Amino acid sequence: MTVKKWKHSGTKKHSMSDREIRNGLLSEKAAEEGIVLLKNDKKILPLNISTKIGLYGAGAGKTVKGGTGSGDVNNRSNISIYQGLKENGIQIVSEKWLANYESIYAEARRAWKEKILEEAKFVENPFDAYAENPFAMPEGRAVTAEDTVDAQTAIYVVSRISGEGKDRRRVEGDYYLSRREQEDIRFLDAQKIPTVLILNSGGPVELTDILEETENIYAVLNISQLGQRGGLALANVLLGKVTPGGKLTATWARRYEDYPCAEEYSYLNGKLEREEYKEGIYTGYRYFDTFGVKPLFPFGYGLSYTEMQIRFHGMKTSGDGVEVEAEVTNTGETFSGKEVVQVYVSLPQDESGKEYRRLAGFAKTKLLKPGEKELLKIRIDRKTLAYFSEEQHAWIAEKGYYAVWVGNSIASLTLAAMLEVPESVILDKTNILENQTDITEEVYDRQNLSARTLKWKEKAENEKIGRYIYYPEPEKRTECTCQPENKIPAKDLLPLFYGNIAGISSNLGAAGIRVPGSAGETTAALYEQYGVFPLIMADGPAGLRLQQNYEVDRETDTVYGIGVLGSLENGYLRTDEIHENADRYYQFCTAFPVGTALAQTWDTALVEKVGIAVAEEMEEFHIDLWLAPGLNIQRNPLCGRNFEYYSEDPLLSGTMAAAMTKGVQSRPGCGVTVKHFACNNQEDNRMGVDAQVSERALREIYLRGFEIAVKESRPVAIMSSYNLLNGVHAANSVDLCTAIARKEWGFDGVIMSDWNTTVPEDGSIPWKCVTAGNDIIMPGNAADAENIRKAFEDGKLSEEVVRMSAGRILNLIHTLTAE
């Protein structure tokens, strides 16, 4: 076997490469498509290029490109909203305010850096000091009348930073507007300046009061976090060069208290060791829509500069699902635009209890000129039309009538058709899981739901809505094709089960050896004797997280290390010195929009293109496995890593992850690692929290996205999560790793742990990871090696298990490293 070889990753050239330019433009395109227009009163947008703009708010000049931790990208540079507007010729009249904020920000960053470096001296893991002290955007000085002179329109940018290791806080300046933000916005309102409010945050910020109590906030845009060229992307939308077409992927509540089980999330109830998912299947819009709780902005919502008409054109049924046809026409007169057609279904209501509607499929049009139309075909998988029965341990397509709704958000739907299933059909008989929860789920009042169900049935009858007979057929399982390794002595295979031990301990992926800043590597212990080459991994999911630059000693050819902190924040926390007689290598990766922003495009073809671009950079920097995409459910808006994830909906999450996977893995030698499997829905005490989830909620909500991604795109790897699930660490869970992933879904790739899951005293047990089907412990340490060796010698870790797990690992290594 020929393997990939190189001397040093990156290039000595500091100049921007053609690849950087090309992928930067793709990042900008994805950013444009992910911007969501939430309000546009008096059609204030798009702006006239001659409009004099007063630009304010923390994110105006310091726009947040993405979240912190492993989801960050150390790219070359970023274009802020201020820069984007200036490059487009917009006259900014608030330069003094912006310059003053620049100095405030610089001082806040300096003080924050000093605090991190000081606290890092007294902790075993420097990343803990970083995670416990997330940087908060400082407040600027108050906006005054002097700052608004000549301003014809105000743009106010609310920015938030969140990241790995800590959940967002329910305080002013985080989930709520800060006191200064409120005062500034109210001041602009009192000045009667038409205002555009920009939300530059990885998740919702509560806006209800400020929107209801002011008169001059004419427009609101949720831009999420748009990567390195977000400022240009937003300018293109504000000026009408691009018509906004993004849609929300999570519900924005009027009040935090409106979210299900809101007061019991994470740290709020004081029980960080146990998280009870009492809401069951009623997450996000499933709760709001089912029980009539009005949100501020609903799931799937997003406005445009033009008007679109959606007409249902018919439906076809087959044993494996349904195909809906819908025609979209741009009925506007001025702007071209795109539309997302969303199809929802209502399942038969019975004693099992179901949500009122669920997203069943979607498609996005091409760019339609005024008067232009397009016919879309939207496929609905049979399992999307089923529910999971805990009593029968099966997915069941239930006898009865199903409503099919078509529109462009959960709040804007038309009853289009009715499906009839003559007899109940078991689609998939599942394995009985060993670990179940003992929690009692919330019991919600379903009286209104029954009335609404009756109402749509009457409407279908009175309006003679088309009725289609659907005969679902059972799923055929894909058998796992894993083969054991039978040639190499079993004891020599043991190092495969933990990463290439580098002596670096971090919950952040920074244990790479051959590519500076890479997350880690599989073992090199079998290379000399058996030619087994180690795989190199890099964090994601907004691009590759590598060290931006590094030095190599010219005489010894050794790389100067910078430590875990040095790999963060584009090297801002680096303390290393510049060395004499050393060459500097550069690794400039592209910072794409965060996962949420990509999902807000609702454009699978575009996400696949982003995946191809990521793979191109993997090839350039010798990365075999990308530790992405992340597709945990956005269960609560306070989760610190929601920005990495796609949606509160499992279908949308899984479909986006599948598109990204297809893109990356279309390039030979490039693989993804879908994560975090499963229920990694909070960051506080993420390594010790026990997620208590009913099997139905687990399968319908929290595992469904993984199932879609595995079956549609065949990712080569899965990463298990830190948390316990119903009493067992995910990396030690036979239910997750073997019973579900391998035996039910036919997953034949490798499952690896998240970083240092075995390090805590009550963490995952190394040898039990292997027996559960979690093949590799990352990044690996001496204690892992000793625990596995002893378990093998004692017979707790059998030779059969060793050979089967090794077979999966060696197959992956061969697939990704052979040329």
Residue map of PLM features:
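Short beta-strand elements
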Residues: S412-D428
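Glycoside hydrolase catalytic-domain context in secreted enzymes
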Residues: M1-F388, A394-I410, L427-E819
